[in-house]
Swiss-Prot record:
Enzyme class: oxidoreductase
Gene3D superfamilies, A to Z: Cytochrome P450
Name used for this protein in its record: Ent-cassadiene C11-alpha-hydroxylase 1
GO cellular component: membrane
EC number: 1.14.14.112
Binding annotation for heme: 442
Organism superkingdom: Eukaryota
Reactions accelerated catalytically: ent-cassa-12,15-diene + reduced [NADPH--hemoprotein reductase] + O2 = ent-11beta-hydroxycassa-12,15-diene + oxidized [NADPH--hemoprotein reductase] + H2O + H(+)
Amino acid sequence: MENSQVWLLWGALSVAVLFYLSTLRRRHAGGKPLPPGPTPLPLIGNLHLAGGTSFHHKLRDLARVHGPVMTLKLGLATNVVISSREAAIEAYTKYDRHLAARATPDTFRACGFADRSMVFIPSSDPRWKALRGIQGSHVFTPRGLAAVRPIRERKVGDLMAYLRAHAGEEVLLGQAMHTGLLNLVSFSYFSIDIVDMGSQMARDLREVVDDIISVVGKPNISDFYPFLRPLDLQGLRRWTTKRFNRVFSIMGDIIDRRLAHIRDNKPSHNDFLDSLLELMAAGKIDRVNVLDMLFEAFVAGADTMALTLEWVMAELLKNPGVMAKARAELRDVLGDKEVVEEADAARLPYLQAVLKEAMRLHPVGALLLPHFAVEDGVEVGGYAVPKGSTVLFNAWAIMRDPAAWERPDEFVPERFVERAPLLDFRGKDAEFMPFGSGRRLCPGLPLAERVMPFILASMLHTFEWKLPGGMTAEDVDVSEKFKSANVLAVPLKAVPVLIK
């Protein structure tokens, strides 16, 4: 190593130590103490507690010792972890505006994505308000969703056809649903099947999106020691930049083909891309906005819904009595109807309860997307949340809070039947919040709450589901593993048996 690099490293470490010592257990300028937490070690803080496969479990265990509002030092980054419904309500109702910015992983700074993405820019930014308004009024409106409902029904039909072709065989359910949902999302947005499609473009797009998802959950020294970001020591931002450039190039080709289609006065595809290009033509958004929206839908939409449905099926196979009850409801409501339609799901309250209970127990976004305190003055549980800190809502722990739920660690869908009007997906009382709450509520919720019960109803109405290899319900492993999302530690395998 050259002398200049050695001195740079030692200088960086010296600054880190001084900065660390200056922040140790100090009281906030307003007089309120910072939340309690585990004693940080020199330089690394509490990073030694962050390893393993179930970070959200560790945070819940630490909260039992230090309290529902807790400080965690990850390197030099101050994190405030909220783990109870009461504390979450206080944070969302009193300080939604103060906490409405996002803590941005350095990986997503590649290509300037975080500086313009609706996922990361602060909600106080006029661009965020404009983009959120466009999604709410042109993409995820009842009218817009109704327009592409035939596409969704056709793609769910394709998924059922795939499962029929493999009836009686062992199927990796997560993989099958991920494939089906990638096609549903891609066809809804720009009328192209991404999986099992002959074009090289489709295969390249699927591969690069999978690559980007895989890097999201990797620990990055740039996030723990922000002053080291310019060095990108692990090369993760450079690696991601190459993938971003590739995915934006592929999606740019899709946009160019559609624009040529429009110039030739060919019939409309009646998908989300047509709606976005109409807005672009009117000057309300630009090409980069369209690219970002398409990318966000791919990275978040299909993956989250597929993982959720895998969790639901795991709990149903582990609880055959619940599955029998859900299938009985389907028979009572649908009778001899062979094919489930999307609108049928609204008439299936117990099936909806099954979905919600699985999401309560196993939220895919166990820690939601991290918030960022943009100003001082935030107090939660009597403690100061300092400006510049990352705020983590442990949704997994909050939705298992014994102060809010009876038998919180058990799979009991009936609780959502009894309290259905009070427990929707919007997290208003922070008791049930798989999609977050407040102004940063997941914008794709209107699509997800239509698609997931529709697919679940189709799977249970079309097939009986068996376990492979002599397994019993007790053998189903619902252990969790946290990477970029909360996933099954053991991928779920099951055998679809066609109902005659």
